Amino acid sequence: MNYTTQMDAAKKGIVTKEMEIVAKKENMNVKDLMKLVSKGKVAIPANKNHKSLDPEGIGQGLRTKINVNLGISKDCYNIDMELEKVQKAIDMKAEAIMDLSCFGKTEEFRKRLIDMSPAIIGTVPIYDAVGFYDKELKDITSEEFLKVAEKHAENGADFLTIHVGMNRKTAATFKKNPRRMNIVSRGGSLLYAWMELNNKENPFYEGFDKLLDICEKYDVTLSLGDACRPGCIEDSTDASQIEELIALGELTKRAWERNVQVIIEGPGHMTLDEIETNMKIEKKLCHGAPFYVLGPIVTDIAPGYDHITSAIGGAIAATHGADFLCYVTPAEHLRLPNLDDMKEGIIATKIAAHAADLAKGVKGARDWDNAMAKARRDLDWERMFELSIDEEKARRYREESKAKSKDSCTMCGKMCAVRNMNRVTEGKDLNMLRDDD
């Protein structure tokens, strides 16, 4: 193999098997895709050690992808349950899964996840550091943090979330500009705490070239984390968030010089009117790199319903440039999600992604909706169920409330507009009073 990474291959004019697969999925010319990869506009996260991967592309002109978060914690240390969640995410065709495990020895779960998953796998190495070394956070050295990142890359993680932009300059800006919610990024808060406790620079920022060595060696995509993402609408688009984004833009160029693919992570909580501007700022400051957003969550008052607040924001964000949506479940801000929460979160996020693809004019996006429209006009209920984003729920709702007329539902009965327009255009009587049809 005469290339190191997908980006290196693209710059050399080499079409990889991963590019061929992605181009076919996206209904696009593989040479056009290769150019986008070479410029960093599209990332194809594909670790050389992830043998079960079915690759996907993330970025300009492609379908909006979704990510599912899962992983073990101290209060919910159940590997079998998390593996059930992995299978649920795979069955529901999530393009990516992030292992956010943050307690104990996580390598066993991570290896099993990567071995079984065709989805892209992302991890956050700093979550693993305390358990990996059995050390307090402040006692972990800069080199040890990098060794954990390398272990995740060696295991086969396709992208690593590293909060490199939380450097001394960003930290100083944060201190000068108080927030209602401080830092709500788990990884960002851990790095900030380590920097404060040790009076040192961010080890990943200081050792960025070594981090790039790791990414280049395994062809790992670097997902530049947003330590200063807003945790409430009052903190959005503030000095800390923008200062960090400027740093991420500079780091992106350094990574591309080393042929390391980059994804930029983004907000967070913000009101509807700020979303489009934030998407444009990221694309400008980070040179068109793919944008990966959590939500955005558009109001802070809906615990138990944040899959809805997130889907609203995600649809708008993806319409205006976001390429990758992290799912949010009804359990957000409350507890670790269960399987039912996962399903609700995945469906809400997939709806947001698809709605944005329609608005962006992604090739082939309308085919699904047009097929549903035809099935509805034909009153072909079986086909409607097959096309539903949640077939099981659609079937159950109709079964629970059956109409006397086989063509209609219990909302309208024989006053169904679709039924009656079909009949009258075919020259048939409406037969409103008879029960025989």
UniProtKB/Swiss-Prot annotation:
Residues at which Zn(2+) binds: 269, 333
Cofactor details (free text): Binds 1 [4Fe-4S] cluster per subunit. The cluster is coordinated with 3 cysteines and an exchangeable S-adenosyl-L-methionine.
UniProt-annotated binding residues for [4Fe-4S] cluster: 409, 412, 416
UniProt record, GO biological process: thiamine biosynthetic process; thiamine diphosphate biosynthetic process
Record key words, sorted: 4Fe-4S, Iron, Iron-sulfur, Lyase, Metal-binding, S-adenosyl-L-methionine, Thiamine biosynthesis, Zinc
Pathway per the UniProt entry: Cofactor biosynthesis; thiamine diphosphate biosynthesis
Cofactor(s) required, per the database record: [4Fe-4S] cluster
Molecular functions (GO terms): 4 iron, 4 sulfur cluster binding; carbon-carbon lyase activity; zinc ion binding
Domain of life according to the entry: Bacteria
GO cellular component, one term: cytosol
Catalytic activity entry: 5-amino-1-(5-phospho-beta-D-ribosyl)imidazole + S-adenosyl-L-methionine = 4-amino-2-methyl-5-(phosphooxymethyl)pyrimidine + CO + 5'-deoxyadenosine + formate + L-methionine + 3 H(+)
UniProt enzyme class: lyase
EC number(s) recorded for this UniProt protein: 4.1.99.17
InterPro entries found in the cross-reference section: ThiC, ThiC/Bza_core_dom, ThiC/BzaA/B
Residues holding substrate: 69, 98, 127, 163, 185-187, 226-229, 265, 292
Protein task: Catalyzes the synthesis of the hydroxymethylpyrimidine phosphate (HMP-P) moiety of thiamine from aminoimidazole ribotide (AIR) in a radical S-adenosyl-L-methionine (SAM)-dependent reaction.
PANTHER family noted in UniProt: PHOSPHOMETHYLPYRIMIDINE SYNTHASE, CHLOROPLASTIC (PTHR30557:SF1), THIAMINE BIOSYNTHESIS PROTEIN THIC (PTHR30557)
Stated family: Belongs to the ThiC family.
Name of the featured protein: Phosphomethylpyrimidine synthase
Gene name of the record: thiC
